[in-house]
């Protein structure tokens, strides 16, 4: 770790390579969008963060106290290829000044190691980049105990960028998210179930620059709804917080009931998805959104055949994207693990509204049309009328309103605190404290002494309400409260 004696941290953002090969107009639009996104993200962290846009990069300078959170957000922002950490030193107008300053900050990094200096230069200096490399390298070699300079396989590479009289010493390089700036490629409505597939599909659309809204069809049970809201908020907050998007809930319990009445068993699954597409299409058109998205993958389950997907698509007259269409389940799970949605998916309450004992795998267009004519569409229209639209940044407040668990601020007799945070930290409180991460709570809670009352604890109380509701709705437990000391 470089000891930074300056009270600010500089980050240099390098644009995603695909942006740089676009035509001038498209490139200009994307880079302006990225700048606006970073301005919004930075302002949410601190008004003291300063941004400056260049033709090939964006520079951000932040007080050290905000550097870690800003770096994390930069690495999660679409449109960025690399994030460089740098120390900026001004008034570097001579080789003598440069060599002294570089040695001051980097001498500890090369102790007992081979090293090399790599420099880039912009400006009208009376020296070249190679002069910087040779001068700085020679000075550091003479003033430090090292294993020497190695031009090919150095253990430490010191990267310098000199812009006129401003020197950047690059101390760390991080791989960015890539993709296109959020909002530069239009808007899409993602059909969310909260499992592996829909969350990964939504992440991929966000990464590609699509402003991604979420729609959830509630087949029954509050636990599933609040779980999907939780993971949708997580995706938005982590990768897309520069834009406000919507979360739409459509009550589908009555639609499912009508399917059981009107549709043949083997076509129930296909018809359910067609009805979801019809409803989502109506919402998308009202919101001026051009496309829908699902997490379906060809042949992942027996009913997801090309024929069946075509039958589902025929219910829509707007574009339906399937980012996972050719991906295998292990690849999807790998991405879910990487982005942090795996544990949400594993902890998601299971609910199956329509179970086809013998689902059709190669459905008939004529048969689907016949089945569709049997369905009472007034039920679907009523469900769409009852849709609830929330801003994504408000859904957790909505969840807490739904929650009915008692909130307490002290530990009583016969009560045990359960710290459900994902981190390894454990709350210090009077009495016994158990550590059970939220994603293990459903499995582990049944093993606990049922004669005790358990106080669920997390940082803001939101996860406690969510997973307490899971246990209350799914397991019929009543010995649960939320702990807010």
Task: Write out the residue ranges for each language-model feature.
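Active-site adenylate/phosphate-handling loop in enzymes that bind or generate adenylated species
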Residues: 135-140, 173-185, 239, 264-330, ...
């Amino acid at each position: 770790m470089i000891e930074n004696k300056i009270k600010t941290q500089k980050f240099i953002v390098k644009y995603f390579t695909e942006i740089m090969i676009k035509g001038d107009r498209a490139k200009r639009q994307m880079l302006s969008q990225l700048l606006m996104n970073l301005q919004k993200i930075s302002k949410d962290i601190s008004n003291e963060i300063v941004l400056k846009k260049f033709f090939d990069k964006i520079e951000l300078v932040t007080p050290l106290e905000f550097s870690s959170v800003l770096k994390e957000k930069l690495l999660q922002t679409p449109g960025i290829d690399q994030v460089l950490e740098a120390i900026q030193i001004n008034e570097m107008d001579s080789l003598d000044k440069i060599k002294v300053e570089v040695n001051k900050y980097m001498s500890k990094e090369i102790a007992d190691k081979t090293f090399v200096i790599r420099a880039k230069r912009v400006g009208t200096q009376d020296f070249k980049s190679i002069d910087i490399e040779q001068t700085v390298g020679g000075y550091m070699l003479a003033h430090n105990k090292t294993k020497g300079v190695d031009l090919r396989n150095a253990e430490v590479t010191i990267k310098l960028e000199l812009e006129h009289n401003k020197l950047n010493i690059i101390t760390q390089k991080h791989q960015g998210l890539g993709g296109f700036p959020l909002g530069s490629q239009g808007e899409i409505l993602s059909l969310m179930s909260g499992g592996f597939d829909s969350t990964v599909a939504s992440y991929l659309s966000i990464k590609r620059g699509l402003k991604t809204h979420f729609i959830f069809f509630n087949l029954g049970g509050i636990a599933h709804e609040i779980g999907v809201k939780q993971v949708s908020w997580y995706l938005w907050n982590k990768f897309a917080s520069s834009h406000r998007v919507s979360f739409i809930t459509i009550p589908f319990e009555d639609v499912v009931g009508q399917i059981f009445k009107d549709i043949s068993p083997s076509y129930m699954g296909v018809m359910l998805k067609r009805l979801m597409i019809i409803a989502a299409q109506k919402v998308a058109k009202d919101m001026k959104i051009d496309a829908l998205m699902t997490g379906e993958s060809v042949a992942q389950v027996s009913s997801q055949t090309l024929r069946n997907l075509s039958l589902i698509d025929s219910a829509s007259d707007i574009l339906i994207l399937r980012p996972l269409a050719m991906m295998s389940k292990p690849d999807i799970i790998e991405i879910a693990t990487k982005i942090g949605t795996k544990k949400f998916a594993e902890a998601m309450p299971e609910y199956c509204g329509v179970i086809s004992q013998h689902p059709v795998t190669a459905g008939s267009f004529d048969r689907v049309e016949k089945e569709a004519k049997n369905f009472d569409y007034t039920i679907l229209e009523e469900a769409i009328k009852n849709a609830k639209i929330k801003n994504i940044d408000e859904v957790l407040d909505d969840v807490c309103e739904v929650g009915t668990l008692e909130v307490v601020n002290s530990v009583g007799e016969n009560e045990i605190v359960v710290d459900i945070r994902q981190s390894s930290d454990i709350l210090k409180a009077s009495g016994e404290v158990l550590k059970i991460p939220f994603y293990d709570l459903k499995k582990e809670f049944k093993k606990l002494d049922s004669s005790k009352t358990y106080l669920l604890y997390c940082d803001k109380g939101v996860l406690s309400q969510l997973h307490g509701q899971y246990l209350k709705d799914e397991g019929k437990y009543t010995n649960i409260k939320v702990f807010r000391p």
